[in-house]
A protein has these predicted regions:
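Long, compositionally biased intrinsically disordered regulatory segments in eukaryotic proteins
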Residues: 1-118
Length: 118
């Protein structure tokens, strides 16, 4: 693990959920605490490929969420634009923990309840 105390894999997963994954990648590369090996691994990542991969991650997560929660699917059907904004916030804040749609749906519903009570 590097001096930044976040593993390479954890960083990539977090960056993939950010609004601007390439900016996160560039910031990490510029981090003076990063060891040389990890910096080189990050520099080897194609920025366009990273951006496309992040879009695919978000798309697949969105699809999983739609399949995993009828409540969420109804919310999207009622106001797609408003739901897209909520999904962006959820996607950025909540790490992906399961490939199963029903688990993604439950995670989202729990997150939404916490947001409503905050």
């Amino acid at each position: 693990m590097s001096a930044t105390s976040e593993s390479f894999t954890a960083f990539v997963a977090r960056a993939m959920r950010s609004p601007d994954p390439v900016a996160r990648l560039r910031e990490r590369i510029a981090d003076a605490r990063l060891d040389a090996d990890e910096r080189e691994r990050l520099r080897a990542i194609d920025e366009d490929g990273f951006r496309v991969a992040a879009l695919l991650v978000a798309k697949l997560r969105f699809e999983r969420l739609m399949q995993g929660s009828p409540l969420v699917a109804r919310g999207f059907a009622i106001d797609a634009r408003a739901f897209a904004d909520v999904f962006r916030e959820y996607h950025e804040q909540v790490p992906m923990t399961s490939p199963m749609p029903w688990e993604e749906g439950k995670t989202f519903e729990n997150w939404a309840r916490r947001q409503a009570n905050a």
